[in-house]
Amino acid sequence: MSMKWISVLLGLQLSCYFSSGSCGKVLVWPTEYSHWINVKTILDELVQRGHEVTVLTSSASILVDPNKLSAIKFEIYSAHLSRGDFEAFFIKLLNILIYDMPKDSFWTYFSLMQEFFWEFYECAQKLCKDVVLNKKLMTKLQESKFDLVLADTIIPCGELLAELLKIPLVYSLRFSPGYAFEKHSGGLPLPPSYVPVILSELTDQMTFMERVKNMLYVLYFDFWFQTINEKSWDQFYSEVLGRPTTLYELMRKADIWLIRTYWDFEYPHPLLPHFDFVGGLHCKPAKSLPTEMEEFVQSSGENGIVVFSLGSMVNNMTEERANVIASALAQIPQKVLWRFDGKKPDTLGPNTRLYKWLPQNDLLGHPKTKAFITHGGTNGIYEAIYHGIPMVGIPLFADQADNIVHMKAKGAAIRLDFSTMSSADLLNALRMVINDPSYKENAMKLSGIHHDQPIKPLDRAVFWIEYVMRHQGAKHLRPASHDLTWFQYHSLDVIGFLLACVATAIFVTTQCCLFCCRKVAKTGKKIKKE
């Protein structure tokens, strides 16, 4: 390690030593791709504040690079599969989700989605086993005396590690399908009458039939669709802990849930004390662009530029789709910077340049940027919100369609279908977003909402992590609803009791009235006889 990094580490340790003694040790159970990019922002800030951060990463990890110089520590464990196999699995999954999924059939689509989820979580369970069944590694983790586990719910295991190490747990997440984890483990109340289910692509302004559709989604996700094979995970967790338990039971013990959105994105809905929004925590003011890129941007003149990226997971696409897109881009007066790593499209215009990587945040913050063509990933959308840039959304998979629906409902985006859009569709969408001032105005309004917060999202995320470490948990924020059964939560037992009381009162009153009537009738007959 260079002297520079040794000095940095010594400085951090000394700052912690001379501070109030509140520096802690954080164990991280990470996820790949955009999830890692988001969490790493939090980790860098924790390290900057003097905390010791250790990331549990497998030898198969795709983005987590332990060899890169960093003040973050990495604990590498041997995985059952190679990095190449893990990456190939994701590429295969992406190709199926983007090109082969029958999106016009609800039942077929979600049935296949469940199959893919189960295959993914089968790999995830093996990674978890590689850690918790490794006695040497677990002994080392226990001896390290960590203060907290920071985990992403998309790959379970963080809650099991927290239970085994007997330390608090903080979650960082965007969503779970159907809000299953948030509702059943976090206890978050999400009334289907006005809160659209994630992946339903509905807004909070629902017609009667849309509310019917939303209720069907709720019932489907609650009683039919299983994101993960719960029985398998319940059995695995029970075997490891040596007592009967469930995945949801352990997840329910999470102290804080950090949701990677905010009210600039979300529709209004109830929130609980141990849930908080940290959307856009990775966003920052734009830096200067590389010289060559800045010259190209400046050459756009008054027309400005368009930024185009389909995210970190999609570096390629079919030639046919690439040519459709390139043809549309060639017809606009703006210069285009396109993140693309495939064969150069035949229809590529002189106004478009291809890059294997783009400084996306810096480009979106450039004064000449007019529009952002995005797949709808949460990180990219938040960079557009942060800088007030209107969007053309081309969602590919997962929550991306839902994200674009949110932006469309707020008047800051137009949505297109990747599989069916023509060059004319993309061209018209770009012209609309660039030339209709309402899109820019709405994007700037969202930007204003995002910036008008008492605490910055990153500071809020770090605050809650430090808060949990200071108080050895945050169980005082946990609502009592966690300890109630479903019928107690909905007061069905109380309603049943009250109905029984009313029924009993009616029955007794009726019987008394009948008795009195009979008495009066008998008395009347006696009087007549006399």
Curated annotation (Swiss-Prot):
It comes from the Eukaryota. Its EC number is 2.4.1.17. It catalyses: glucuronate acceptor + UDP-alpha-D-glucuronate = acceptor beta-D-glucuronoside + UDP + H(+). Keywords: Endoplasmic reticulum, Glycoprotein, Glycosyltransferase, Membrane, Microsome, Signal, Transferase, Transmembrane, Transmembrane helix. Residues 1-24 form the signal peptide. The modification N6-succinyllysine is found at K136. Its main location: membrane. It is found in: Microsome membrane; Endoplasmic reticulum membrane. It is a single-pass membrane protein. It is an enzyme of class 2 (transferase). Glycans are attached at N316. GO terms for cellular component: endoplasmic reticulum membrane. The keyword Signal applies. One of its GO terms (molecular function) is glucuronosyltransferase activity. It holds the Pfam family UDPGT. InterPro entries: UDP-glycosyltransferase, UDP_glucos_trans, UDP_glycos_trans_CS. The chain crosses the membrane at residues 495-515. Coiled coil: none annotated. UDPGTs are of major importance in the conjugation and subsequent elimination of potentially toxic xenobiotics and endogenous compounds. This isozyme has glucuronidating capacity on phenols, opioids, and carboxylic acid-containing drugs. Belongs to the UDP-glycosyltransferase family. This is UDP-glucuronosyltransferase 2B31. It comes from Canis lupus familiaris (Dog). The gene is UGT2B31.
